[in-house]
Amino acid sequence: MKVKITNLRALYDTGDIKISPITVLLGKNSVGKSTFARSFSLMKQSLFINRSEPVLWYSPDLVDFGSFKDSVTKGYDEIGFEYSFKLSTEELELFSRYNFLLRTLSLANSIDENFNKEITVRFSVKENQISYINILFLDYNYQIKYDNRYKVESFIINNIPTSLGELYSRSDFSLGEIIPQINLKNHPEELSGSFSLGGRAFALASWKEIELLFSKIKDGRTNKNTIQKILKKVILGDYKSFEKDFEKTIKGWKTIYQKYLGLKLDERQSFTSRLYSLIGQVYYNSVVDLINEYLSDYFSEVQYIAPIRATAERYYRIQGVSLNDITSQGENVPMILYNLKPSEKKDWKEWTRKNFDGIEFDVKQDSSNLSLILAKSGQVINLADTGFGYSQILPILLYLWRKTKMKRTYFRRGFWNTNSNQSLLIIEQPELHLHPALQANLIDSFTRIVKNEKLDVSIIIETHSDTIVNRLGEHVMSNKSNINSDDVNLVFFEEDKENNGLAKLRQIKFDEHGRLKGWPVGFFEPGPIKSFLGDAQNVD
């Protein structure tokens, strides 16, 4: 996944930030690190509720950005989000062949397995609405602009505007939807009540345009079925490959092929360019479904852990709180531990003992109350009687253990299942109240979990700790670790003094020897001590 954000608080333009297995956010205070880290939870809380605006700026359970006006960079009126992700050939084939809408139209092209499978979606948000969408899929470049009532002002594919009539999108957003579908106003499919397929009218109207285009090369015996047979044989990829494959395919229909060759060269090029664009129109709402489903699946597995986590209390009342996700401050950790099965509890304690210096965490019930217990070296202590460090690290450890042991719950919105199993853990300042040795132990656990192919976990760490950075470098250098330089991305945030102090981001990598390339010298060093003599001399 690559992410780009523009005009969100201090983030004027992040550039394309690669989310590596381990991504570390570094920089001084108030330069946009937390804004970037929390933007993932912002998308999560937006996607999983029916709402009247694309982005839900406040949620009591996740993050609070206030409002759009509080969030947009001063002097600007829109915020931009961009996400790029890759799908496997198998996933794209499933999309093409088993998409219900495309099956209905008998247009389920195979997709060129050698073509770039990356999909990029960009969208700009003004107050209460999306104003612009740009999608890059295969060799299609979709650009959609809206007015303030979600009427489509322009719909352009590969620089070719659509000519279908009045287009619009709904102004409300349903569960799992961030990119709205395009609808065709006053179309019979919409008025007949079969519009529940979502955007079917737009696809059908685009198909009619394809039939009209074929009138230039068809004979009297060519009908809709013939056109469908031709297009089902054409492989989709980049435009040049499509053009060659189309010409190769229509050789099986002698009259059509002869009429096609009878066109002038520029007319043939115009024909195939228009055809490629119209197939893109047919695909558009299905591509939107694909994007919404992928992003819903990705953000559903975001776990955010805040910098200030719940401190241990002496007693907890047994409650019926949510146990699916660990809350951002870890308030529900005692109840999650309480509800573990005996076999799970045994495994949990063995895991923490093995990975964290012989430490075990458990809960003890006394009537209707619970106590968090820490056991080490034969001693059992109420967690409230230990230092802050253990209570701060507990939610992180519990998340890591759950990822290694518990089955994945998929969010499935639509017609198509992916094999995605990816999860994203975001932690702000995991080093709080932790001795450097425990910080190193934590990083060791992170490296083990991100290299487990069955889990597909990525971790974003916002930190001020040189211990964490140095430990990652040791893992890159060490022959005992599976971590290499491509697995770690350090994102350095700094003030751009030439741009009103807004954030400027740089991505820094380790080399194969664990040395940082382009590291800002003295970043972790304090400035020189200033003289206080002047202050002392002014004291009466």
Give the role of each language-model region.
Residues 1-92, 342-525, 531-539:
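Switch/communication elements of ASCE P-loop NTPase nucleotide-binding domains
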Residues 1-298, 357, 361, 476-483, ...:
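P-loop NTPase switch/coupling surface
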Residues 17-20, 96-101, 316-328, 506-508, ...:
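Short, polar loop/linker segments at the starts of domains and inter-domain junctions
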Residues 233, 278, 339, 433, ...:
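Charge-dense, low-complexity intrinsically disordered segments
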Residues 243-393, 398-420:
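Extended helical coiled-coil dimerization/tether regions that scaffold
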